[in-house]
């Protein structure tokens, strides 16, 4: 389930912006909240990042190379548009990242799928992230802890275990 949620987030946002186009986040513990179509409550998680594991757009998803991307950076904003082929579906995403990536950022994106993907025709994804301080002593860079206690490392996405 965790991987499915992260795959959906990455599909909405991850293919739209290449990781090298985003500013790097400050190393440490980031608290995130994501609202997705069909979810009754936001998905919350904490992630320990450093310069090697910082991938806002989702290491968990295989990047689809069949995307046409456009980005425009102004001050603390990064607007993006992308048209991607995901299997037989074309996804069209438009959104914006806002923030300094040192203390926090938000992202909002609107995606349409043609034909619908997993029964979904379109949706708006919103996320907010705040730097919380140094990583906890029991976390290493790449560790993600979901609100239900599931813990995994983005570098070892084959294992998801209960904390």
Model-predicted segments: where are they?
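Positively charged n-region of N-terminal signal peptides that target proteins for export
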Residues: 1-4
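Hydrophobic h-region of N-terminal signal peptides that target proteins for export
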Residues: 6-18
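N-terminal helix-cap/turn-to-beta initiation motif at the start of protein domains
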Residues: 17-28, 73
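Short, solvent-exposed loop/hinge segments that bridge or flank secondary-structure elements
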Residues: 32-66, 149-157
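Short beta-strand segments that buttress and anchor functional surface loops
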Residues: 32-35, 79-86, 107-115
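Hydrophobic/aromatic beta-strand elements that line small-molecule binding cavities or substrate pockets
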Residues: 45-47, 67-70, 91-99, 109-113, ...
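Mid-chain, structured segments of secreted extracytoplasmic proteins
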Residues: 58-102
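Edge beta-strand at a domain terminus
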Residues: 119-161
